[in-house]
Amino acid sequence: MAKKTIQYPPIEQYSDIVAEPQYDLFYNNGNNERDEEGTLRVLSLFSGCGGMDLGLEGGFICHRHSVTNDDWIERQLNDNWTLLKRNRFRTIFACDILEEARNSWLDYMSRFRVNPDIYHLESIVDLVKMQEKGLDVFPHHVDVVTGGFPCQDFSVAGKRKGFDSGVSHKGEKRDDNLPSEETRGKLYVWMKQVIDIVQPKMFIAENVKGLVSLGDVKEIIQKDFSSAHGNDYIVLDPQVLHAGNYGVPETRERVIFIGIKRSALKADALHALEQNKVPSEYNPYPKPTHDFNVHDQSLSRPVTCKDVLGDLPEPEDSHDLSQKTYSKAKYMGNGTQGQTEINYWGLGPTIRSEHHGNIEYRRLSLLKFRI
C-alpha cells in the first residue's frame, strides 16, 4: 500500500513568514494581536533569553514526538515539526543584567510584537530599590511571577558556596567576605520581595538539582518564599523534574518551586493544597508525558537527539553559519572538554555556557545551541 502523502499548507498564503534556516522550515505565527480578554499577565525575573517566558506563551515550533496532545498543535509544518498554539500567558515585564540575553530575548519575542521597553537591563536588587524609593517600576495586576534565580552557587559543577556567594548581584566578584543579602546566592530573597510588591496569584521559581543536596538550602528557600506577603502563599514541596520525561532530548534536571496565593483560591482548592499529600487533580506539577526514567510503558517514548538533529545536513554541507561554526580544537583524549560526542540515539547532555556539559562533554559553539 502506497504511503499517504500529507499536503501541508503552502507558505505563500501566509503574510508574516518566519524562517528556521537550520531545518528549512517556514511558518507564520498567525494572528499575533493580543487578546486582552482572559489573558494571564506574567512578570519575568532573571529572564535570560526567554526560555521560561516562551514556554508559558507558546506559539513556537517543536518536534512532533514531543507533543502528546493534538489540541496543543496550531499547525503541522512537515512530517517532523509542528507549530504550537499560543497560550493565555503574556509577558509584560522581563529583566536581566546581561545585554546579550536581552538581545536574544528581543530577537525572538519580537515575532510576537512585544514592546522592547518591557525588558529591563537591570539587576533585580536595583529594581526593587528603585521601587522602594517611590518609582513605579513593576507593573500592576500581575497574575504570575516567574524566575530562574542564579544557579551557579548551588550547582554541583561549581564551588557550591550557596548563600555565601563571592559574586555580587551584578555578576561581579566581591572583594569582601562580609555577609550580604545582595550576593548572587541570595537573589531569590529579592524575587520574594518582588512577590511582596506585586502579589501575584502564583509564582514559579527554578534552579539546579544540586540545590536539593546542599544542606537545608531547599527548606530555607521554601520557608522564605512561604513568608511572602504575610504568609499568604502556599509553597508546595519543591520537585525535581527531568526534561527527558517531558519530550525534551536533554538530560537536564531542575528543581521547581511553586507558590499559590491563598486568598486567590476557592475553598476546596485551598483545603486540597494544604494537605501533606496534594490530590492529583489539584497538583500543579506536570505529570510526565514521556518515559525516560519513570518506567511507565503507557507514556510516549523519549525524544532523542536523532529526532531533533537528524534532519540537519553535515556542517560542511550547510549554508547556515550557526551550524558551520564549531570548535575544531585538537583531540586531547578522553575526559577532557569537548572530546565525547553526544549520544545520537539517546538524550543530549546539559550544555553550559562554557561549551561543555556537566557530565558529558561536547565541542560546539554557542551559536549552534540556538537551534
Language-model regions: role of each:
Residues 9-199, 209-215, 219:
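Core alpha/beta nucleotide-donor-binding catalytic domains of modification enzymes
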Residues 1-89, 224-228, 253-371:
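S-adenosyl-L-methionine-dependent DNA methyltransferase catalytic core
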